[in-house]
Amino acid sequence: PVVWQDGWPRLANGGIAAPETFEVAGDAPTPNTSFAYETHFADDEDLWKSGWLCSRRTSGGWWSVGPEGLILKGGDSPSSAYERSELVQRARSHAWHAECSMQFEPSHYNQTAGMICEYDSRAFHYLFVSWDEDRKCRVIQALSSDKGAFSMPLGDAGIAVPDTVESIRLGVSVDGYDLVFSYALDDGEWCVVASADGNPLVLDASIMSDEHVGFGAYTGTVVGLTCIDMWDKTATATFDSFSYQDC
């Protein structure tokens, strides 16, 4: 503790070194570091004041907020250094859960939209809705990049989405090194995204870290929403909710 003498601050113990322990008046409050955020993208919400971040450009007509929610126009791929259509929130702990609700009607396999967890354009996990040309239906798929090395954790067999489904909910849970995706169709039950053997697909969350990425590493992990159209730039995705919760 510090006291003032003749206009100068002095240590209360009269010495020049702070004691290892000291008493304070009253009970010390327990800090609450848990963070939670939820939005339905109201017309009057200031996205930037709500902590949303974007890559390189804040204007240009690639996003808008209306009565139906947040609308993203299809932009470049997650590995692009140019015109990406993406809005993200910072991940604030080592254990957290985020989810969104969206409507998306792709017509080409190069049109995707969904939830992305990333460090930068070299390191990310992406759960998305796209179009399967063989099955002629929408599918839920996943794409990962580890220092620029791409992989499709679900292989070619995405999760089929029936034509009657209007709203698709996507979720991601991170617990330390483990990242697990989930999904729900309309008002149905949540399902964990599974690998080919039927077990939950567990991805490596540690690839999205300063230590792993290495050179040029400073961004921190983010999670959010994106729409990609590498076909004709006509696709749009509507997101009517997003939530984030530290666990």
Where are the regions a protein language model picked out?
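Extracellular glycan-recognition regions
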Residues: 4-247
